[in-house]
Amino acid sequence: GLQRDKMKLGILKEPEGEMRVPIVPNSIPKLVKAGLEVIVENGAGDLANHSDSEYESKGAKIVTRGDVLNCEALISINPPNLDDIREGCILMCVADPFRNPDVVNKSISRGITLISMDMIPRRLSRAQSMDVNSSQDNLSGYKAVLLGASHVPKGIPMMTTSAGTVKPAKFVVMGRG
C-alpha cells in the first residue's frame, strides 16, 4: 500500500503566566504509537517544569514556533493568535466559545477547524478521558484549599502530641463542582 506521511501534532508554548501545558511528556509515546509525529515549541513545558529534553526523550521533536505553526493539528490550553494559524489546520484548545464567540467566528472565516476541548460532553463515559473541565476543576479545588489553609492561623488537622491537643480549624466550603 501507499505510505502516508504521519500527521504532525504541534504543541504550542502558552502565553506568559500560563503554567499549564496541553500535553505532558509522558503522554507523547501514546501519541507516537497512534501514528502522530509530535512537534513541540521550544520552551513549551518550562513553566510546568517539563524540559525540552524530557519531551525529546519521550519521542517529540523540539522546534521553533514558526515550525510548530506549520503542523496540520495544533493543541494549546489558550487559543493562540488565529492570524498565525494556517488555513485547514485543526486547532484544539479551551476556546470557551460562549464567552469568546470571536474565536469561533475567526476560526470559521480563516478555514480553521476548532475543537473546543471545554465543550466535550462531561456526562458521556467514553468522553471522560478527554474532559478537561473535570481535571482542571479538581486541581483548582485542591489548590483553593491549599491557598485558604495558608491564611488560617490554626493548624488544619487535629493533632495530639505529648504537649497536648491542637484543635483543628473549621472550614466552610461554598459552591460545588
Q: Can you say where each PLM-predicted feature lies in the sequence?
A:
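An N-terminal-biased, well-structured beta-alpha scaffold segment characteristic
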Residues: 3-110
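Glycine/serine-rich phosphate-binding loop and adjoining beta1-alpha1 elements at the start
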Residues: 5-8, 82-170
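Glycine-rich Rossmann-fold phosphate-binding loop(s) that bind the pyrophosphate
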Residues: 174-177
